[in-house]
Amino acid sequence: MKIIINNDFPVAKVGADQITTLVSAKVHSCIYRPRLSIADGAAPRVCLYRAPPGYGKTVALAFEWLRHRTAGRPAVWLSLRASSYSEFDICAEIIEQLETFEMVKFSRVREGVSKPALLRDLASSLWQSTSNNEIETLVCLDNINHDLDLPLLHALMEFMLNTPKNIRFAVAGNTIKGFSQLKLAGAMREYTEKDLAFSAEEAVALAEAESVLGVPEEQIETLVQEVEGWPALVVFLLKRELPAKHISAVVEVDNYFRDEIFEAIPERYRVFLANSSLLDFVTPDQYNYVFKCVNGVSCIKYLSTNYMLLRHVSGEPAQFTLHPVLRNFLREITWTENPAKRSYLLKRAAFWHWRRGEYQYAIRISLRANDCRWAVSMSERIILDLSFRQGEIDALRQWLLELPKQAWHQKPIVLISYAWVLYFSQQGARAEKLIKDLSSQSDKKNKWQEKEWLQLVLAIGKATKDEMLSSEELCNKWISLFGDSNAVGKGAALTCLAFIFASEYRFAELEKVLAQAQAVNKFAKQNFAFGWLYVARFQQALASGKMGWARQIITQARTDSRAQMMESEFTSKMFDALELELHYELRCLDTSEEKLSKILEFISNHGVTDVFFSVCRAVSAWRLGRSDLNGSIEILEWAKAHAVEKNLPRLEVMSQIEIYQRLVCQGITGINNLKTLEDHKIFSGQHSAPLKARLLLVQSLVLSRDRNFHSAAHRALLAIQQARKINAGQLEVRGLLCLAGAQAGAGDLKKAQLNIVYAVEIAKQLQCFQTVLDEVCLIERIIPASCEAFTAVNLDQAIGAFSLPRIVEIGKSAENKADALLTRKQIAVLRLVKEGCSNKQIATNMHVTEDAIKWHMRKIFATLNVVNRTQATIEAERQGII
């Protein structure tokens, strides 16, 4: 998307009249966002920009006016901020501006007939100006608001519907009152709060326009996420050139909310707005109960219709919520003005959810009230719901610790839930002690024992301790014994199996269990498990190296209400941690210490082996790229120490392999230690292939450093074989580059260049950008002779072309088709065919013979069932292969 930074919009053709000066001032130092333009002639005739204050509605409108005038076409600008505007005033203003363009000439009307005073008469007059009906004219109406009378709004809508087709309208406001006719007629396109919010790219462009130099792009992207793109807030925070822990407490933001929103609405609605901020979401009945009133319906309707301050919760049309930053601002006002009622109101809100069976919200709000005593009488069903279906790990841990100790022994299910929480808090030893004690009890009458929740907790808990083989056996056994009578437990067990298969690169088995798990979890409303299914799918994408697919999975997870990304703090933090490696690979890592420290704190308390290693490896690699070798090794040593403390041997071995790789460049001899590492029992399990591949790569680098290039190439080939066996794309890319380095060191530049080209092509297809950059940097330091090979294939240009922090979204279906139909080399050939290269040019580019390219083309034609290059390109694009 092209973004134009505007300091002086090209309005030379417009003329230096008052309206031009007024409109030009509105866009000074703003950015032009083409995605908000109405330039498309096939678009509806009316464009409505509607959102709360500060979303750039007027700016978008002004840019449209200037764009229209710059093209030499007539444009009318009218601001309706004044509540005293009448239909006569509006009609007269439009006529006056149209007359300057000679669109209408009422002086030629016969004597005794005055200019139209009503909009419907003006519409008729415009139809009579047949000579001008081909000239596209834009009428911009700014500040459409609820203060305008409904008859006036209806007159405006009728005017828009009844004017000639060459007249188009752009409208900006904060109300939807009066627009029903336009919606019904299908004559209107809406740009809402979501559309008007800044994207990360737009915020970066704004920072450039404002010469903001102190905030890196990654931090700007994080800022946009935190304020959900609210343009006014982005501007205020960029000008400060530093983020704030509590954005609503920033003086400029506080003043803006107070002046433009809070003080701008009537008193009764201010009270409602402030009260609503105490609730996670608001419904009329809930509000009326909590605050003992009867005006919930009218207030919600007024604020959502006339100010756009309340928005629908996705998938829940009866629920409304506030923008999170605005909600924090309003909460501060509420607690400051009336602190004594805090606990009382929160308890009423918690009890409201409790009565409706919404225990997740009830527990969360009661924790904010610092009072959980009333919840001691929870039934077993409720506790199980919170533990297994909602996955409220943090809230449950806090709540359970506050319960009286006697309650623990009165209800065995409390101990089971606590064991569940301990497993997901990396305290497996304590959890197993609890389970052992409970297993020794022989009370067969307890419901918790009949449903075998204890055995399920043990089965899934083993996976959190990285005891995958034991966990898989116990989960399968539990499903066969109890799955038919316990859908919630079956969904949890199937989800655990999915995570195990993703961790062990068993992707064929993963596909089968995912389909079954999704069906069961949907039936059982297993929200916590849905989040973990996304984790399993994301792990598969990362393990395969398919970063475009991984990005798509994250996006889907964040918008899927079943995954509870917004409702569950635990699930949200889990995805933040997983996303770190993806962002590093795409070169858009948020390196703010605050963000990193939060993620590191989370994984130290809750991170299973795969998540823990993913985060530490990404942070270590990032530090190494900044020439911070000590910091790079430090976090890996921390991971290793954590692994020893928690008895996680796989994490210990992976961390040690990464440490050895960091030490290779320093000339430290470690080949003997690497050989002894192979004897570790972890290399005989299901995780052996990726572990062996990682170890072989480090061994190859060590041998190359010692100039034993033949053995180094052999180790690299073995690593490639291991990677291909499990479809680990990133490891294959690294293996090919290590092989090329060894070959270059041995003097075989032709083979080295061939493998470099192949590695780069795989990286392009996978979009694993940083892998290539990191590996090449390492190899060139260890094997100086390899620099010539990398230079010969113009690697800098190749990397520069695909290492930008923008990716092509690749759907899963396309990923699978590409893997199933064509080889990576064939896809590489097709890409070059699409660029117009001849067979000879492709052969030169890929460092192979022309006959080899012809052979690949015949295979491609046969696979895609086509007869020529053009058809092959079209069919491959249709199937999403290229």
Curated annotation (Swiss-Prot):
Binding sites annotated in the UniProt record for ATP: A51, P52, P53, G54, Y55, G56, K57, T58
Record protein name field: HTH-type transcriptional regulator AlkS
InterPro entries: Sig_transdc_resp-reg_C-effctor, Tscrpt_reg_LuxR_C, WH-like_DNA-bd_sf
Induction: Protein expression is autoregulated and sigma S-dependent in stationary phase.
GO biological processes: alkane catabolic process; regulation of DNA-templated transcription
UniProt DNA-binding residue ranges: 839-858
Domain HTH luxR-type: 815-880
Entry-linked SMART domains: HTH_LUXR
Highest rank taxon of the organism: Bacteria
Presence of the UniProt keyword S-adenosyl-L-methionine in the record: no
Pathway(s) it belongs to: Hydrocarbon metabolism; alkane degradation
Transmembrane segments: none
Alphabetical UniProt keywords: ATP-binding, DNA-binding, Nucleotide-binding, Plasmid, Transcription, Transcription regulation
An example molecular function term from Gene Ontology annotations: DNA binding
Function: This protein activates the expression of alkBFGHJKL operon in the presence of alkanes.
